[in-house]
Structure formats: structure tokens, C-alpha cells
């Protein structure tokens, strides 16, 4: 009688999944609520200030999302190597990721600093003089922070790739506490307005990058950079990272370009419309937290399963994480839909802007329930498989 193959033990128990997911959930919640607090504090300076920050952030998000896609590529490669128990190549791929993102973010940051005004004019056209003045100040300082957020995203992605989401959560906590404290001190204490908000963000990102690089060099971390020579760019591992990072960056970039076009169109409708769109973008991210959390969890879970050759387990975990994402999105969007008329009163908006903001978020809630998870969570399962 032929022997039957022994079923492979689950790579991720329920406890292991919970241990991975809850720090990611807390990290996303921190990021979103601190982002809302940022908008809330800037709104106290005036609609021109919050409008300028919103316009620049739409451009910042486009740039950071495209560059951060490289971090996703590196995390996928590292998680697959870890699934195969090949720690040497996993470590080399991590070092190459730091090199690629370091060079890319420094280059982009310098270009944005040198050409800040032409870029803003080219993207947003003619906007109020006050909005343009604030926007240029905010964009210039934001560009300085690109290398630091790039290093943070690289380190966070690599820690998640090995199933350790606690470190990225702590780094996010440090960054957001510094950001919110810096906002309070610089915006309200020193009356620095938009410049204060930008400096608080920069300082938070510097601390987060330093913290996560320090944690990366822990002797027990299989993805630590063991030698400075490992950081020297090497064609083969870089091409593996880029083979996933570039398509992912183009996908993220196309979506963000669409949002940027909306922001550009909104900028022609006046300061109230820009402010309403800014607050709507900030508040709507609350409803995305469950989906965004599962998106981050997809990379290490599916990547390690496929790296170990466990396709059936990869399929099962994909369905599980998608189910959690869809359920969480439905509940979060329902809650925000009901509470939005109250939430909008937290911000210093005119009556006209408050009404527009509420309408925008309500429409977002209706579509998010049905399309967010399949648009943003599911693709990370494909990326984890190298697609």
C-alpha cells in the first residue's frame, strides 16, 4: 500500500498571525490618527495653510509611494529567501534594498528641493498666492525628509518580511509621537505655521530612520547588514528587487497620479474646496485601516509560504486575510458614515467646506466597502508571489 504524504504543518498558526497582525493594526491606527491630528492642527492656522499642506502631501504621497514600492520588492525577495531558510541571500537582498532606496530617495529629494516652485506650478497651476507660498515652504522641507522616510520604509518592510511587526510599530510610534509633539510646540508654541508642521514631520522621520536602522543591526536579526561591502550595488539582487518594485511602483503611481489630478482640479475651485478635499482625504483613511493592515500582513505570510513551496497554504492564508479585510472595511466604513457629521466639526472649516467634506467622505464610504480590498489588499498577495 502506497504511503501517503504527511500534511505540512501550518507555517503560521492563529497565534502567529495574531502576533503579526495586531502591531500592524496599531501601527496603521497610529499613522492615520496622527495624520488626522496633523491636519487638525494645521487647520487652526487657516484654510490657506491646510490647503497648501494638502496639495503638497498629494505630491509627497505620489513620490513616496513610488519609491516605497521598492521596499515592497525587497521585502518580497527577503521573505521568500527566509521561507527557503536561506538567510545569507536574505541578508544580501536586504543590504541591496537599503542601497537602492538610499540612492533613489537622495536623488529625488535633491531634484525636488532645487525645482520646488516649477514643480508646484506645473502640477497645480495658478493657485492663491498665500497657498503657493505655504506650499513651497512645506514642499522644500518635505523633500529633505525623503531619504529618511525611504530608510524607515526599507527597515519596516524587512522586519515585517520576517514576521516581526513589533519593531515597525515601535518605530511608527516614535515617529508619530515626535511629529504630534513637534506640531504642538512649533505650530502653537513658536507660531511657525506650515514650516513648523514640515519640521515636525522631518524630525519624526529622522528619529524613525535612526531607530529602525539601529534595530536592524541586532545580532539576532537575520536581515542585518553584516558588512559595509554588502551595501555596494550588485546587479543580480538589485534586478530582483526592481522586477517587483518597478511594476508595483507604476501601479501605485498610476493611482496616486489620479488622486493628484483630482487635487489639481480641486485647486481651481477655491480655497474652501481644497480644504474640504484635504480633510476628506485625511478622515477617509480611518476607514481604510483594516484593509491597509491586511495588505501589510500579506507580504510576509504569502511570501514565506511560497518561498517554502506551500502553494495551498498561500491560497488559504490569502482567503483568510481577504475575509478579515473585507469584514473590517465594512464595519469601519459604516461607523465613519454615521459619525462623519460630528467628525467634520473637529476641524476649523467654513460651513461650505464642512458640507463638501461630509459629502465626499460619504461617497467614499459607499465605494470603499466593495472595492478597496480587491484593489489594494489582494494585489499584495500577487506581489508576494513575485507578480
Annotate the PLM regions.
Residues 36-40, 110, 154-158, 177-188, ...:
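Alpha-helical transmembrane segments of multipass membrane proteins
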Amino acid at each position: 500500500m502506497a504511503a501517503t504524504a504527511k500534511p505540512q504543518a501550518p507555517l503560521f498558526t492563529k497565534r502567529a498571525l495574531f502576533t503579526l497582525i495586531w502591531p500592524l493594526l496599531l501601527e496603521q491606527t497610529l499613522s492615520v490618527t496622527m495624520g488626522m491630528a496633523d491636519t487638525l492642527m494645521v487647520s487652526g492656522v487657516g484654510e490657506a495653510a491646510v490647503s497648501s499642506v494638502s496639495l503638497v502631501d498629494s505630491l509627497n504621497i505620489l513620490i513616496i509611494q513610488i519609491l516605497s514600492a521598492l521596499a515592497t520588492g525587497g521585502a518580497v525577495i527577503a521573505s521568500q529567501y527566509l521561507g527557503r531558510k536561506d538567510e545569507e541571500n536574505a541578508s544580501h537582498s536586504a543590504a541591496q534594498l537599503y542601497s537602492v532606496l538610499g540612492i533613489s530617495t537622495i536623488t529625488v529629494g535633491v531634484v525636488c528641493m532645487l525645482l520646488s516652485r516649477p514643480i508646484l506650478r506645473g502640477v497645480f497651476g495658478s493657485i492663491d498666492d498665500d497657498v503657493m507660498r505655504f506650499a513651497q515652504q512645506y514642499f522644500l522641507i518635505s523633500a529633505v525628509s525623503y531619504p529618511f522616510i525611504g530608510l524607515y520604509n526599507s527597515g519596516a518592510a524587512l522586519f515585517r518580511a520576517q514576521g516581526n511587526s513589533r519593531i515597525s510599530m515601535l518605530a511608527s510610534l516614535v515617529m508619530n509621537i515626535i511629529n504630534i509633539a513637534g506640531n504642538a510646540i512649533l505650530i502653537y508654541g513658536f507660531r511657525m505655521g506650515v514650516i513648523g508642521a514640515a519640521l515636525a514631520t522631518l524630525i519624526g522621520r529622522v528619529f524613525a530612520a535612526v531607530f529602525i536602522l539601529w534595530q536592524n543591526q541586532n545580532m539576532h536579526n537575520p536581515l542585518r547588514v553584516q558588512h559595509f561591502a554588502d551595501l555596494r550595488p550588485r546587479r543580480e539582487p538589485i534586478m530582483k528587487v526592481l522586477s517587483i518594485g518597478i511594476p508595483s511602483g507604476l501601479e501605485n503611481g498610476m493611482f496616486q497620479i489620479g488622486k493628484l489630478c483630482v487635487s489639481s482640479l480641486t485647486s481651481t475651485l477655491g480655497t474652501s474646496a481644497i480644504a474640504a478635499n484635504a480633510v476628506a482625504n485625511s478622515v477617509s483613511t480611518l476607514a481604510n485601516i483594516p484593509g491597509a493592515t491586511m495588505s501589510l500582513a500579506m507580504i510576509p505570510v504569502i511570501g514565506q509560504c511560497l518561498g517554502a513551496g506551500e502553494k495551498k497554504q498561500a491560497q488559504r492564508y490569502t482567503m483568510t486575510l481577504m475575509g478579515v479585510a473585507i469584514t473590517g472595511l465594512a464595519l469601519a466604513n459604516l461607523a465613519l458614515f454615521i459619525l462623519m457629521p460630528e467628525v467634520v466639526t473637529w476641524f476649523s472649516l467654513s460651513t461650505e467646506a464642512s458640507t463638501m467634506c461630509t459629502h465626499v467622505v460619504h461617497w467614499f464610504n459607499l465605494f470603499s466597502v466593495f472595492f478597496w480590498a480587491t484593489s489594494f489588499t489582494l494585489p499584495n498577495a500577487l506581489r508576494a508571489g513575485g507578480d
